[in-house]
Amino acid sequence: GSGAGPAMMAAGGAMRMAGGPSRSTLPDEGLAPALDGATDWLNSTPLTAEQLRGKVVLVDFWTYSCINCLRTLPYVKAWAEKYRDQGLVVVGVHAPEFAFERKLSNVEKAVKDLGISYPVAVDNGYKIWRAFHNQYWPAHYFIDAQGRIRHHHFGEGGYAESERVIQQLLQEAGSKQVDQGLIDVQAQGVQQ
């Protein structure tokens, strides 16, 4: 076979919401699934729901040969850096589209070459993908400190809205020093 996983497709651009989200505009999309079933973890030991409770979590489903994923990566990396000390945990979930993306050494090289320092779950069995009922790369799920999904975004774009969601969830979690500014990423093509 081609090595393709379950009904997957890359998501393109997305609609933007005018203005930043307020408390009432962030729905409760249900309890986030545990990040169980990864075949390997890079940059971290396996993360459990218990370890993540009390933290705001951004789960980023990606694969290293997806151009849309690579274009969102500078934003995800910048958020991970900017908000780490305020309680944000970014977890990359690498779900392969092609057979060569299942090879751990290829994923390790991509993570190193792309400068990804946050935890990456290698989801070669699509267990995390299926638990989230995910269908797209890239896909971002924003999880509050109580472990509930409060926002999701598929594809490129929506960066200001996504960052406002992170800020709001950190404030809800009790972080007092949330920087209200937005990151300025000069993403020119693929970051290498």
Sequence positions of predicted segments:
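N-terminal "domain-start" segment that seeds a small globular fold
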Residues: 8-50
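Signature tryptophan residues that serve as conserved aromatic anchors
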Residues: 41, 62-65, 69, 79, ...
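Short active-site neighborhood of thiol/selenol oxidoreductases, capturing the structured segment around
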Residues: 46-70, 76, 90-91
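Active-site acidic short loop of glycosyltransferases
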Residues: 53-55, 85, 116-117, 134
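Structural microenvironment flanking redox-active thiols in thiol-disulfide oxidoreductases
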Residues: 70-114, 122-129
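Thiol/disulfide oxidoreductase modules built on the thioredoxin-like
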Residues: 112-118, 122-165
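PEST-like low-complexity, intrinsically disordered acidic/proline/serine-rich tracts
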Residues: 172-192
